[in-house]
Amino acid sequence: MLPAHKLTLETLLAETVKQVATASQGASEAAFVSPAITLERPKVAAHGDVACNVAMQLAKPLRANPRQLAQQIVDALLAQPQAKGLVEAAEVAGPGFINLRLAAAAKQAVIAAVFAEKEAFGRSQRDAGKHVLIEFVSANPTGPLHVGHGRQAALGDALSNVLASQGYDVHREFYYNDAGVQIQTLALSTQARARGLAPGDAGWPASAYNGEYIAEIARDYLNGVTVAASDGEPVTGARDVEDLEAIRRFAVAYLRREQDMDLQAFGVKFDQYYLESSLYKEGRVEKTVEALIAAGKTYEQEGALWLRTTDDGDDKDRVMRKTDGTYTYFVPDVAYHVAKWERGFTKVINVQGSDHHGTIARVRAGLQGLGVGIPKGYPDYILHKMVTVMRNGEEVKISKRAGSYVTVRDLIEWSGGATPGSEAAVDLIDEETIRRGRDAVRFFLISRKADTEFVFDIDLALKQNDENPVHYVQYAHARICSVIAECKARYSTDESTLADVDVSPLTSERAMALLNKLAEFPDMLQHAADELAPHAVAFYLRDLAGEFHSFYNDRTERVLVDDAAERNARVALLAATRQVLANGLATIGVSAPVKM
């Protein structure tokens, strides 16, 4: 149902309920407070287009039979002049549900709405003026992005688009963990390669990174290559194998650039890259620790500094500063979230792997301990589960380049049709292969709820049939483009006039089902924003594509017919469907091909 129709119906029902309730009680309408009117889609299509349970809500306080009360509301509603043209029929079902069937004209109105709003259809300004920071990916600059980072990128970027569709001012942020033990390991690994060592050689560091990318970094360092991340200063290889700090700076810059390239291939952009090292340089970590000590939220035991996280629901207190004077990994996270708060972001969402579950209570406890007014549930978290990559029925665990895991770039290239293991598949992939791969990976990785494990089947991603969900949706868009092009060629159909077409011939069951699905798009986006559920967009697109294919494959709904009225109405329906498919695909960062 279109938002305008929903608002009208909610208002009508509220007025009708007030009339019926006050008449039965003999009270004044001014004294009656109507409960919130909730409209839902019935689970069974045969039960109508809209269901409402207001009669059951009021039955007890009004001491009335819910079915009888529902019937009174139905009779009064249908008598309202404003209901004409909006509600075709209403009936009482079950214990007192009110089931409404919308008039055909109300359903057909979605076509005019889509033509009027075009790319803006489905969007609203409901949350205009609100600001949200979404942190996602946030990988250590110690290697290429893996498939888990890919799932974060798909989820975080789609969620950003969903919230922006409702008027939010969205700030996308990538937090670089460029301090700590892993960065030291990266430097030592690169130094070992620069000295000519390889994994397995005597003298190779025990905890070193073994991927081929380390050899590439060492080679470019020794050759004096200059590299820079998108927001960083250029760093030139110093060629000195003994200068570990120079190696560290070069390796971090090199991998930040590589991760930028991975994200570019994935079509993801960030508003800001925030460096963990900056927290130490600016004294934010020390300041946060000192504030917690001053607030009495810490204590010393066995040479370590502990945070009283049990005060805020954690199962045990946690070490903040170890006996060697270094901080545990959640301490800079607390300082980082203070920085988010101080920048004015009162709503923050972190998209992270489920392995971060244990840090949630610690970070929130630290923020509460500071006593600076940060709400208890700050920040929000979306935790995703692992991704397993399958090909030819077997799990793929190793990437030649990364050494121990499948990278995002691997997944994009393989899903686009590049051959795993081929040298050409690293740097010489054409744009069309990247587009196909990016579309498949992005759609697949948000096609399940974040808290479910996901099996990414490369073979399925390569299929050009209805089994492949992204192909199924994109083909619906391309198919409509083809039909409209044929209409132009055969009947000189002018797309610019479709907004004025009489769509009253669209009365069949298939047409009504497709119209209903189009009208659900705005509500679906609002629900996805409220529930932080970008997967809802993928679910919707599959359903919409299904309704279109069912309509188009029905021989009684042929579009290319001689009857101009029937043909133009159906072309208008297809054009509206094409627009909504394109809008939905754009929301999740997937292209809408004209040809396939």
From Swiss-Prot:
One of its GO terms (cellular component) is cytoplasm. Coiled coil: none annotated. It comes from Paraburkholderia phytofirmans (strain DSM 17436 / LMG 22146 / PsJN) (Burkholderia phytofirmans). HAMAP family: Arg_tRNA_synth. The lineage of its organism: Bacteria, Pseudomonadati, Pseudomonadota, Betaproteobacteria, Burkholderiales. Monomer. One of its GO terms (molecular function) is ATP binding. Keywords: Aminoacyl-tRNA synthetase, ATP-binding, Cytoplasm, Ligase, Nucleotide-binding, Protein biosynthesis. This is Arginine--tRNA ligase. A motif ('HIGH' region) lies at residues 139-149.
